[in-house]
From Swiss-Prot:
Organism: Lactobacillus delbrueckii subsp. bulgaricus (strain ATCC 11842 / DSM 20081 / BCRC 10696 / JCM 1002 / NBRC 13953 / NCIMB 11778 / NCTC 12712 / WDCM 00102 / Lb 14)
Name used for this protein in its record: DNA replication and repair protein RecF
Gene that specifies this protein: recF
A GO BP entry: double-strand break repair
UniProt record similarity statement: Belongs to the RecF family.
Signal peptide residue numbers: none
């Protein structure tokens, strides 16, 4: 799978673009705050209909514009696809081969993308919200059902929280309605949690292999799901998860009314990374944290290939300078020249020529993008 052409207008500070990409490696060179990250964000948004930087889609519409339009041509083994997504102040709409999609869950998955940014270095020791977002972004693009239940859960959770606030302010008193909302939240939550366990089982295997290959150590990396309802286990089916959630909701009913917010569910769950059984959040060095983060990204590539039969595209946003030669070499070994890769950097010397011997290079300045005629080694393309 690769993205051969990309067009955009009205997205952040980027000038209108119509770019052709190399099927292998594309490098975007420029100083900070010139638009490199915005470009990768735009490509990522075209793929999964969400930003890795903000949950407010309106922020991505350029000042003075009514909408942003992203479009691209995707080449797969069996077919070519034209994708388009438009962000407006009313929402977003998506098309596949000029056919508008009834739901975004029908659109997502036609172009799979893995993005690795400096913020991902915080996955191990950062806030739990970063790890939950990691799961939702990555698992959502490989399974429309996950995306559907995640969207449904967010809507139901907001409704339940709003009603809990009304009860706390004595603006409502219908406990039957609260029971209905609790049942609906537990149903969506159980489906989401069950799928998280399933995907993490495969991700675990690939991440452990990647960690050993990168570090050269015998340390075992494990990724564990930590549900906010401690009674839930990986062996539970959705019906069992739902019942355990309902039991816990009954136990904490008074506390939720007092706090006026939902205390359990996927929005409170977390991931734990362990090295040889020790919590990496507490014990991992900075180098180990970087290796864990890179291992997760490489594991995602393997997982998507396993589930879809296609390599995703890989977006590396200013992270090459964060990786030493060994980690860059490990990255090369895993992508095997089969994964289309987009790299942003302020300095070409930070990128190993063993990884990108003859990339297509673009300069970015003030949102304008032009192609450079020479590769890393100075030879004309």
């Amino acid at each position: 799978m690769y993205l051969s052409r990309f067009k955009q207008s009205g997205f952040r500070n980027l000038a209108p673009l119509n770019l052709e990409f190399d099927p292998h490696v594309n490098v975007f060179l420029g100083e900070n705050a010139q638009g490199k990250t915005n470009l990768l964000e735009a490509i990522y948004f075209l793929a999964i209909s969400r930003s890795h930087r903000t949950s407010n889609d309106r922020e991505m519409i350029a000042f003075g514009q009514d909408f942003a339009s992203l479009a691209g041509r995707v080449h797969k083994r069996q077919l070519d696809l034209d994708l388009r997504i438009v962000i407006s102040k009313k929402g977003k709409s998506a098309w596949v081969n000029r056919v508008e999609q009834a739901r975004l869950s029908k659109y997502v998955g036609h172009l799979n993308a893995i993005l690795f940014s400096p913020e991902d270095m915080e996955l191990v020791k950062g806030a739990p919200s970063l790890r939950r977002r990691f799961m939702d972004l990555e698992f959502g693009q490989i399974n429309p059902e996950y995306l559907y239940f995640a969207s449904q859960y967010r809507q139901l959770l907001q409704q339940r929280n709003n009603y809990l606030k009304q009860l706390a302010r004595r603006q409502a008193s219908d406990q039957v309605l609260l029971g209905v909302l609790t049942e609906q939240v537990a149903t969506a939550a159980s489906e989401l949690i069950w799928r998280r366990y399933r995907y993490l089982a495969d991700l675990n295997r690939y991440a452990a292999e990647a960690y050993r290959a990168i570090s050269g150590q015998r340390e075992e990396l494990r990724v564990l799901y930590r549900p906010s309802a401690k009674e839930i286990t990986a062996a539970d089916q959705p019906a069992q998860i739902k019942q355990k959630l309902l039991d816990r909701f009954a136990e904490i009913a008074d506390d939720e009314l007092r706090r006026a917010t939902t205390q359990l569910g996927p929005h409170r769950d977390d991931l734990e990374f362990q090295l040889d059984g020790k919590n990496a959040h507490l014990f991992a060095s900075q180098g180990q944290q970087r290796t864990i983060a890179l291992s997760l990204k490489l594991a995602e590539i393997q997982l998507i290939k396993q589930l879809t039969g296609e390599e995703p595209i890989l977006l590396l946003d200013d992270v090459m300078s964060e990786l030493d030669q060994n980690r860059q070499a490990a990255l090369l070994n895993f992508i095997h020249g089969q994964t289309q890769t987009f790299i942003t950097t302020t300095d070409l010397d930070s990128i190993s020529q063993e990884i990108v011997k003859q990339p297509r290079i673009f300069y970015i300045h003030s949102g304008q993008i032009i192609e450079k005629e020479e590769g890393l080694n100075g030879r004309r393309r």
